[in-house]
Amino acid sequence: VYLKDIVERKKIKRLDILEATLDLLCSSVGSLTNPNNVAKAMNSKQKLSGEDLVSNNTVTSYMDHLADAYLFEECKRYDVKGKNYFDYPNKYYCEDIGLRNARIGFRQQELTHIMENIIYNDLRIRGCEVDIGVVYATEKSKAGNNVQVAREIDFIANHGGKKTYIQYL
């Protein structure tokens, strides 16, 4: 029903690509992704080439349509020290975990990703603006050199001018 509404309202011509985009997003909740990765995965899985290739623009448009239909929400990554947002990759969370599970046939029950999605939804229900935090740290490599590594803060919840940093695992 929800896909039919999107197809009618947005005049979607390629239902197969919309469904594949939905399936890939359902399978990757809580993982960093972007339209380019989704398009590459679709083209590779379906062995598409030439004019049949799914473009990044098409995937971006379809991801936007899924978000407009309240099926997914994009959560941006935020550089805590640099105080700016990254363009890509971001995370996408299902607005309804039950729909996500039904869509992918109740397989892929990665509890950490599902729990992350549930926590994200709870924070949003409580009225928080939510970002994924990124902090850079210096660590020693195996060769003994200092290297910069990005560390993730699961959530930065902003509510009423107050920031709360949440690391659940």
Task: Identify the residue ranges that each predicted region occupies.
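Accessory nucleic acid-recognition modules appended to NTPase machines
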Residues: 1-163
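Short beta-strand-loop-alpha-helix junction that forms the active-site gateway
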Residues: 162, 168-169
